[in-house]
UniProtKB/Swiss-Prot annotation:
The modification Phosphoserine is found at residues 12, 314, 316, 336, 339, 477. It comes from Saccharomyces cerevisiae (strain ATCC 204508 / S288c). Interacts with snoRNA U3. Interacts with MPP10. Component of the ribosomal small subunit (SSU) processome composed of at least 40 protein subunits and snoRNA U3. Keywords: Cell cycle, Nucleus, Phosphoprotein, Ribonucleoprotein, Ribosome biogenesis, rRNA processing. One of its GO terms (cellular component) is nucleus. This is Something about silencing protein 10. Belongs to the SAS10 family.
Length: 610
């Protein structure tokens, strides 16, 4: 050990002699720092603790001395050779990953259960993941390859059957599952296992064919029975008298029979071309059969004869009957009120309106019947479901309730009650139309006025004992004429005054609005606002007319800071050319002189600041 220390001192002296230029301050500091570090190391401690250091001569130097580093390298090589001779799973793991394998297993267990069953096999440091491919030894590489194959084999053993599934295989399995279900169904219904084609069905005897159709297509028998029963009915309706009801029945029955014939054609087509065809339950034609059957049921309940004859003659008869009825009504009213000319004229207007309403009602009834016929014709078309623009899934129950309500409305439209209710609504509107405005007071009827006058006279006679004596005569037509002449004049004046006031108010408002618009165009709205109208109201001003609000005009650039800065930069770029020369792309063509002219007093150079 002393020799080693002396060797170091000798080499440092030799290093000083080799350096001919001497040391500067930086090299001197670095050399002192190295000496301090060597003194604090384990080599320095071992030199101090060794007793033989005093006995050995410092000048003695070993020939071909071996450093401690070389010895450690040789020892490592020997250890690696020993490990190569006996390299088990744990040793290979340590060599690959740089740490011992932590297992609780006994050494007698198989080597295959040593690594993959350990959850802590992977380390958490960088050295355990990098540099594993840089192997110098072939034996270690073989061990690693062997371990990788073993892990791969174990991984394949742990794979489940679902991991190997492919889409095509899954489809085949679904198909086989369907075939199995069909086999079970046939076994439960005691059918043959062989597939039946159209030729097999045709070759069957009547009983076997009926059993097959009754089992596979249970709707076939009742539909064929209805078709045979209703076909003669269709011919009868064709030959019967032409009116609206028979026409509706013919259209409804034709659509129903046509849908049944479509069912037969689709059934034959599927039996010819589709091997997997087993049922017609999910086909859209079944829904159409139910719809057309319901329409035919409702149409069959209509009466066979139409009471009102069609054509121009029937319409003239109707109008003649209505006019005769209205003339009777008019004569009765004129006899009851001979003197009241205005009331008679107004009642004439009401009667004319009733005539018009009755005509309109008849037209609406015709339109309603046409609409129903149109609906029956449209029901034969294939109705595509409407796709909503915002298909949004709703998690609430209210949407389902709304769908149910919509379906109820659609079902109501298919019935004749819907159209009769529409007619009733028109009748109610007509009665509401005769009521008039609530603001205008009603004229008192003659009978009500007489009763009111009698009650007032009776009350006056009861309270006023000193009143005039009444004669024994009954209340006659002269008293009626006197009371009517007294009351009608004041009532008519008040009635007309209220009506005139409302009309004048509407006219004045329209004129004020027109004047305000004209004044706004000419810019004289302030002058118009100063003038007060006859009802004490001023005209509208500019703020009310334009309705721009209270907020002032604001710049739109303040809403977007990026746009604001961009416009500010563009404005500064325009001003920059007036301050200093800006390069704008160089000379475009041949030199044509200074385009702006040479100005003697203009200086565009930039002055540098210190």
């Amino acid at each position: 050990m002393v020799r080693k220390g002396s060797n170091r001192t000798k080499t440092s002296e030799v290093g000083d002699e080799i350096n001919p230029y001497g040391l500067n301050e930086v090299d001197d500091f670095a050399s002192k720092r190295e000496k301090v570090l060597l003194g604090q190391s384990t080599f320095g401690d071992s030199n101090k603790d060794d007793d033989h250091s005093l006995l050995e001569d410092e000048d003695e130097e070993e020939v071909l001395a071996m450093d401690e580093d070389d010895e450690s390298i040789d020892e490592r090589e020997d250890e690696e050779e020993e490990e190569e001779e006996e390299l088990d799973g744990a040793a290979a793991y340590k060599k690959i990953f740089g740490r011992n394998l932590e297992t609780d297993q006994l050494p007698e267990e198989d080597e295959e259960n040593g690594m993959l069953d350990n959850e802590n096999a992977w380390g958490s440091t960088k050295g355990e993941y990098y540099g594993a491919d840089d192997l110098d030894d072939d034996e270690a590489a073989k061990e690693i390859e062997k371990e990788a194959l073993r892990q791969q084999k174990k991984h394949l053993e742990e794979l489940n059957m679902n991991d190997y599934l492919d889409e095509e295989e899954e489809e085949e399995w679904v198909k086989s599952a369907k075939e199995f279900d069909m086999g079970e169904f046939k076994n439960s219904t005691k059918q043959a296992d062989t597939k039946t084609s159209i030729t097999d069905i045709l070759n069957m005897d009547d009983e076997a064919r009926d059993n097959y159709l009754r089992t596979m297509f249970p709707e076939f028998a009742p539909l064929s029975k209805e078709f045979t029963e209703l076909a003669p009915k269709f011919d009868e309706l064709k030959k019967s008298e032409e009116n609206e009801f028979n026409k509706l029945k013919l259209i409804a029955l034709g659509s129903y029979l046509g849908t049944i014939s479509c069912y037969y054609s689709i059934l034959l087509h599927e039996l010819h071309n589709n091997e997997d065809f087993t049922s017609m339950k999910g086909h859209p034609v079944m829904e159409k059969i139910l719809t057309t059957k319901e329409i035919w049921r409702q149409a069959s309940e209509l009466p066979s004869s139409f009471d009102v004859n069609e054509g121009d003659g029937s319409e003239s008869e109707e109008t003649a009957n209505i006019e005769a009825f209205n003339e009777k009504k008019l004569n009765e009213l004129q006899n009851s009120e001979d003197s009241d000319a205005e009331d008679g004229g107004k009642q004439k207007q009401e009667i004319d309106e009733e005539e018009r309403e009755s005509d309109e009602e008849e037209e609406e009834e015709d339109v309603d019947i046409d609409d129903f016929e149109e609906y029956v014709a449209q029901s034969r078309l294939h109705s595509k479901p409407k796709t909503s623009s915002m298909p949004e899934a709703d998690d609430f129950i209210e949407s389902e309730i709304a769908d149910v309500d919509a379906q109820d409305k659609k079902a109501r439209r298919r019935t004749l009650r819907f159209y009769t209710s529409k007619i009733d609504q028109q009748e109610n509107k007509k009665t509401d139309r005769f009521k008039g405005d609530d603001d205008i007071p009603y004229k008192e009827r003659l009978f009500e006025r007489q009763q009111r006058l009698l009650d007032e006279a009776r009350k006056r006679g009861m309270h006023d004992n000193n009143g005039a004596d009444l004669d024994d005569k009954d209340y006659g037509s002269e008293d009626e004429a006197v009371s009517r002449s007294i009351n009608t004049q004041g009532e008519n004046d008040y009635y007309q005054q209220v009506q005139r006031g409302k009309q004048d108010k509407k006219i004045s408002r329209k004129e004020a609005h027109k004047n305000a618009v004209i004044a706004a165009r000419e810019g004289k709205l302030a002058e118009l606002a100063e003038n007060v109208s006859g009802d004490g109201k001023r005209a509208i001003n500019y703020q009310i007319l334009k309705n721009k609000g209270l907020t002032p005009k604001r710049n739109k650039d303040n809403r977007n800071s990026r746009v604001k800065k961009r416009k500010k930069y563009q404005k500064a770029q325009k001003k920059l050319k007036s301050v200093r020369a800006v390069y704008s792309g160089g000379q475009s063509g041949v030199y044509e002189g200074e385009k702006t002219g040479i100005k003697k007093g203009l200086t565009r150079s930039v002055k540098f600041k210190n």
